[in-house]
Amino acid sequence: MRDRRGPLGTCLAQVQWAGGGDSDKLSYSLKKRMPTEGPWPADAPSWMNKPAVDGNSQSEALSLEMAGLSLPSGGPVLPYVKESARRNPASAATPSAAVGLFPAPTEYFARVSCSGVEALGRDWLGGGPRATHGHRGQCPKGEPRVSRLTRHQKLPEMGSFWDDPPSAFPSGLGSELEPSCLHSILSATLHACPEVLLKDETKRIFLDLLNPMFSKQTIEFKKMFKSTSDGLQITLGLLALQHFELANSLCHSLKYKQNNASRLILRVVLE
């Protein structure tokens, strides 16, 4: 039978085998698979892959990079990152240790978000062309469509998480979104919560975890950042999950439109 898992599914299976299923081992296995020097562009942040010689200067550099990220409503994420770091001084003192788990410059997350969130707001999140039959337009304004789907109806949505990352963005969305950028975000996502992605009982409700991130009502989104127990690591992980899922969702939204357009053209030709 043909393997339908796709590149991400195959990667997860390989990592699960190498790590023996334990989340700590999985994280270590993922980190070990990443190149030491990484395919970073010339303008990659200076704090990437460098020892924490000066905790304060590293924190300042990280703050500057995080300044470009925003909440679903457009508000800055940085205050919530700072609050998380304040409550967890150990992670704030050695930010490079936390960042080392996520081999993707935070500017990459901002690039992905800026390129995808607007289109998704119109289509996928607002009950557009990918809406499940019988659920189009039934969600309150500002809430993600998936919040109203049953668990069974959410299963097809999980398919959007198993695509090849570069395919999520056609060339027309900007040359700055290079494959190395998207692959870095993929790595960050896998580091963030491998136990969620690898367990059957949790991956089925993965979209439930993402609902606050996709909601325009940012109260729950802010609460999520304030309640993180592991500081900067979890905060960056949540951001990685948000933007990678945006990328994959956009990919499926565009594919849906392209398929519909192809069918329409074929019908016109046949008639």
From Swiss-Prot:
GO terms for molecular function: STAT family protein binding. It comes from the Eukaryota. One of its GO terms (biological process) is negative regulation of transcription by RNA polymerase II. GO terms for cellular component: nucleus. It holds the Pfam family FAM220. Signal peptide: none annotated. This is Putative protein FAM220BP. It comes from Homo sapiens (Human).
